[in-house]
Amino acid sequence: PTSTLNILHGENGSGKTSILESIHLLASGRSFRSRNLEPLINSDKDEAVVFARLLDGKEIGLSKSRRQKHNLKFRSEKQSSWENVARELPCQILDSNSFLLLEGGPKSRRHFLDWGVFHVEHSFVENWRRTKKSIANRNHLLKHRSPDLSQIAAWDSELCLAAKEVHRAREEYFQVFLPLFLDLYRKMNGVDVDALIIEYERGWDADRELEDVLLESRGIDVRYGATQSGPHRADLSFKIGRNRAVDILSRGQQKILVSTMKIAQGLLLSQALDRKCIFLVDDLP
């Protein structure tokens, strides 16, 4: 071990990935291998416990039992969410699933973008929660056989206010992130940087206000029982010329692209907050 690098080595099944998973679980409340946390508890135990002491002396503890919800503590105080811990322990995972950033659906790319925004703009969390609440209530109304249009209109207004702030924060972050990434990508010997086009798509028509889009698409939304436009539909597009980057790049080139994006995100966090990002690298293929 050194001050900046730790290498875990051992036989297959010796627990190397489990250590990385414990750090990631403590930092985010999620496993990078499974949506279900139950397998993290040893078969002969009723509870899993993870504890960490940071360099500045702050302590983080997490326990998860089979019969109860998790119990998260930061500086000896119980936490109702991971917000404080996530800010204190920023982690990026690089593993075989990292390719989902290119190959997967928009959700993985939104998560990537929002991870960065979360760490540099504290108001983002509250605006995103407002957005989620508005969409959930709007969708609930849309599923009714005879939707109350006045209530839908009220949630439209709330959604548009929150969505405006979410979009602003994402766009501002992306404009700072992109040149930093491209500069690093050149140094990583990727494909011709000038041929690579990465764009942020906000989730509704770029030339129209969300209010107008929601009003016009209300009939479609009622038919599907879900809101079709908004920040929950945002995405990042990767192209080489006119083609999707994932269809052009080799597996090795995709690895360089995805790894560089995550490293660039960590560098941007360090520049903005003077805090180091923890990179967990697990058996890249």
Per-region residue spans from a language model:
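Short, flexible helix-adjacent loops and helix caps
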Residues: 31, 143-147, 271
